[in-house]
């Protein structure tokens, strides 16, 4: 791209045109359409649904005492070993009740393709795509294998008893050493030569709408043992079973599913995959390879979309950015609380003059003129806190400036540089790695480690220890991959120019977007 090309608010000419809707694999909304479809759902919803729901609940609760009986009286030492060959009559009863419960939900028959390998051949099963809370029906087809679940689920009636029943592997988010223990337990069971039951994983780690495969987490692949990929398909005319992070709620999915005469389900066992030496040493590489195999079999894209915490993210180059930027949510709640964008420039001037840097909750409320405690708490908690519990008011000012649709992308990039750059010994203002990370963290929520990779790439061809304003603006406005963040992703919804960031299927930049193919950004 030559220096003569314009770098204003709209961006390069090839990006002009009508606004497109960003693809979100964590979103699914379904409503019955047409008179006959609506009539069928409402008629069956008031007749078939209550009966099915009641019967399914009865069979679910019947499992409770039976599951508890299997582990009753066993010591912790006995439970640390496999009990798959003990009290097998109870295993068969739970299997029968589980299948009957799903039958009552509408899963009258299941089409099975391929052959499930024994535990000695494939100790781990990986299932995808994970698109609904009905997916655990696959455990019935797989003869009730162990699963990996949160330790908090032990306190849920029935569910906790079933987790103990099949000796599930439990992980605690509060215990820092829990994940290490889980890895060790998975390795122990995976290398037991079939003594333990198979362990079943949903490697995506969360539900998607089934149109793509989400990024596989490496947990199922750390042991480096063979795995058997298992595909799930719901070849129904209406996508009623899908339950995602955003969209139809639990009750609505239950109602839509159980208000149909029956639900089609196909489960396909692919051949056992044996990892290479390189994949055994690198769980992430192993996970990516298995994801590609399953995506090809499903004829669906293998993507890098994932859920981090409670935020769905998408990769843009080395960065991971929220699919639905939270900065617009902050703008909305502040506007409802009476905050006016007219005061933003005054706050920015305070930061540029060095008058206001780090603030606490009360001082933030005073600066913004917002008295509602719940509102100011939500705003405060969005930003990164230092060891003393304070936040950087420069980040607040930048996020507020991004809300202004009259400010061009280039102006926003220059403001970000002015707020976070520092003067070096030679009197030059440069943006350091920390300042660069703070900008991307505040506006797109990108972790510092990922921002550091991008910063290192940008500084590869310069002798300076940072980016000049010209270098940063070129990154924000002209970089073949990352320019989409400032030109479109960070344009306020009211500007009418919001577009999805330029995403490659594998999450990276294409060959022409490789930093080595750019001129240096000094």
Swiss-Prot record:
It is an enzyme of class 2 (transferase). The chain crosses the membrane at residues 43-63, 92-112. Pathway: Lipid metabolism; phospholipid metabolism. InterPro entries: EF-hand-dom_pair (IPR011992), LPCAT1-like (IPR045252), Plipid/glycerol_acylTrfase (IPR002123). One of its GO terms (biological process) is phospholipid biosynthetic process. Glycans are attached at residues 166, 517. SMART domains: PlsC. Keywords: Acyltransferase, Endoplasmic reticulum, Glycoprotein, Lipid biosynthesis, Lipid metabolism, Membrane, Phospholipid biosynthesis, Phospholipid metabolism, Transferase, Transmembrane, Transmembrane helix. It catalyses: a 1-acyl-sn-glycero-3-phosphoethanolamine + an acyl-CoA = a 1,2-diacyl-sn-glycero-3-phosphoethanolamine + CoA; a 1-O-(1Z-alkenyl)-sn-glycero-3-phosphoethanolamine + an acyl-CoA = a 1-O-(1Z-alkenyl)-2-acyl-sn-glycero-3-phosphoethanolamine + CoA; a 1-acyl-sn-glycero-3-phosphocholine + an acyl-CoA = a 1,2-diacyl-sn-glycero-3-phosphocholine + CoA; a 1-O-alkyl-sn-glycero-3-phosphocholine + acetyl-CoA = a 1-O-alkyl-2-acetyl-sn-glycero-3-phosphocholine + CoA. Its EC number is 2.3.1.23, 2.3.1.n6, 2.3.1.121, 2.3.1.67. Its main location: endoplasmic reticulum. It is found in: Endoplasmic reticulum membrane. CDD domains: LPLAT_LPCAT1-like. One of its GO terms (cellular component) is endoplasmic reticulum membrane. A motif (HXXXXD motif) lies at residues 130-135. It is a multi-pass membrane protein. One of its GO terms (molecular function) is 1-acylglycerophosphoserine O-acyltransferase activity. It comes from the Eukaryota. Residues 496-522 are annotated as: Disordered. Residues 503-522 have a biased composition (Polar residues). Displays acyl-CoA-dependent lysophospholipid acyltransferase activity with a subset of lysophospholipids as substrates. Prefers long chain acyl-CoAs (C16, C18) as acyl donors. PANTHER family: LYSOPHOSPHOLIPID ACYLTRANSFERASE LPCAT4, PHOSPHOLIPID ACYLTRANSFERASE. Belongs to the 1-acyl-sn-glycerol-3-phosphate acyltransferase family. This is Lysophospholipid acyltransferase LPCAT4.
């Amino acid at each position: 791209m030559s220096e003569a090309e314009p770098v204003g608010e709209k961006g390069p000419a090839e990006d002009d045109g009508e606004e497109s809707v960003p693809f979100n694999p964590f979103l699914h909304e379904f409503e019955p359409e047409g008179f006959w479809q609506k009539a069928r759902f409402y008629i069956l919803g008031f007749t078939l649904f209550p009966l099915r729901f009641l019967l399914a609940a009865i069979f679910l609760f019947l499992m409770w005492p039976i599951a508890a009986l299997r582990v009753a009286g066993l010591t912790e030492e006995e439970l640390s070993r496999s009990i798959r060959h003990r009290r097998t009559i109870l295993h068969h009863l739970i299997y029968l009740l589980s299948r009957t419960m799903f039958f009552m939900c509408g899963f009258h028959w299941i089409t099975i393709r391929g052959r499930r390998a024994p535990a000695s051949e494939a100790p781990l099963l990986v299932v995808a795509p994970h698109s609904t809370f009905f997916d655990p029906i696959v455990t019935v087809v797989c003869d009730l294998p162990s699963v990996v679940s949160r330790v908090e689920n032990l306190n849920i009636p029935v569910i906790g008893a079933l987790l103990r029943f099949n000796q599930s592997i439990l992980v605690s988010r509060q215990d820092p050493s829990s994940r290490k223990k889980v890895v060790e337990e998975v390795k122990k069971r995976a290398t037991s030569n079939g003594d333990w039951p198979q362990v079943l994983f949903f490697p995506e780690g969360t539900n998607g709408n089934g149109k793509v495969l989400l990024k596989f987490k490496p947990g199922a692949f750390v042991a480096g043992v063979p795995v058997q990929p298992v595909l799930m398909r719901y070849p129904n005319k209406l996508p009623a079973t899908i339950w995602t992070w955003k969209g139809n709620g639990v009750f609505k999915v239950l109602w839509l599913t159980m208000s149909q005469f029956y639900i089609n389900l196909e489960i396909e066992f692919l051949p056992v995959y044996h990892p290479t030496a390189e994949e055994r040493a690198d769980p992430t590489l192993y996970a990516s390879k298995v994801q590609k195999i399953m995506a090809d079999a499903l004829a669906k894209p293998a993507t890098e979309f994932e859920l981090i915490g409670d935020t769905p993210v998408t990769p843009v180059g080395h960065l991971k950015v929220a699919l639905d930027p939270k900065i617009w949510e902050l703008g909305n709640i502040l506007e409802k609380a009476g905050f006016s964008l007219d005061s933003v420039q005054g706050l920015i001037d305070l930061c540029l003059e060095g008058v206001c840097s780090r603030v606490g909750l009360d001082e933030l409320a005073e600066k913004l003129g917002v008295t509602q405690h719940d509102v100011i708490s939500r705003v405060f908690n969005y930003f990164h806190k230092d060891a003393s519990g304070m936040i950087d008011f420069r980040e607040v000012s930048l996020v507020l400036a991004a809300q202004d649709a009259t400010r061009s992308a280039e102006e926003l990039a220059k403001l970000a540089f002015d707020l976070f750059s520092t003067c070096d010994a030679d009197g030059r203002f440069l943006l350091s790695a920390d300042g660069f990370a703070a900008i991307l963290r505040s506006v797109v929520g990108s972790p510092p480690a990922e921002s550091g990779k991008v910063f290192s790439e940008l500084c590869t061809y310069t002798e300076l220890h940072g980016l000049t304003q010209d270098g940063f603006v070129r990154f924000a406005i002209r970089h073949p991959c990352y320019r989409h963040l400032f030109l479109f992703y960070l344009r306020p919804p009211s500007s009418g120019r919001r577009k999805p960031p330029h995403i490659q299927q594998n999450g990276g930049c294409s060959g022409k977007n490789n930093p080595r193919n750019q001129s240096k950004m000094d």
